[in-house]
Amino acid sequence: MNYEDTNIGTVFIAPASYLIEELEEKEKEIFKNRVFQYDNLVCGIVDKIDSKRGYVWVTFKVPDNNYVDPGITLAIDFKANWCMFCVVKGGKRFSSYQFLCLKEQDIIEIIKNKDYD
């Protein structure tokens, strides 16, 4: 994935370790403890592009048993290493609601089947 692929509704897979090392200290713990990870990979969706501030707002899926917050939203700098992010195949864009309805097993299947570019 590159910056040009970051459209609202794009669902992607990214290495959790890369994101964790790029986060500020207090965000690191929240991310490690609350975002659903499988095989060191996380699944997210592009929610908003803030050109003025230079950030892309993304929501990451949390474990299915968390009924309070189905996702955690964080800002990712435009200068991030976008080639670490892989678009989920099919090119279909999701609404935020559709993304938050994904189950852990759906994400595991995407990762196991390498259903991303």
PLM region descriptions:
Residues 11-16, 40-45, 75, 84-85, ...:
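Extended low-polarity, hydrophobic cluster-rich segments
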Residues 26-74:
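Basic/aromatic-rich interaction segments and small domains that mediate binding to polyanionic partners
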Residues 4-7, 42, 106:
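Generic short amphipathic/hydrophobic targeting helices enriched at N-termini
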Residues 55-117:
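Intrinsically disordered, low-complexity, charged/polar segments
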Residues 5-36:
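Short coil-to-beta transition motif at edge beta-strands of beta-rich domains
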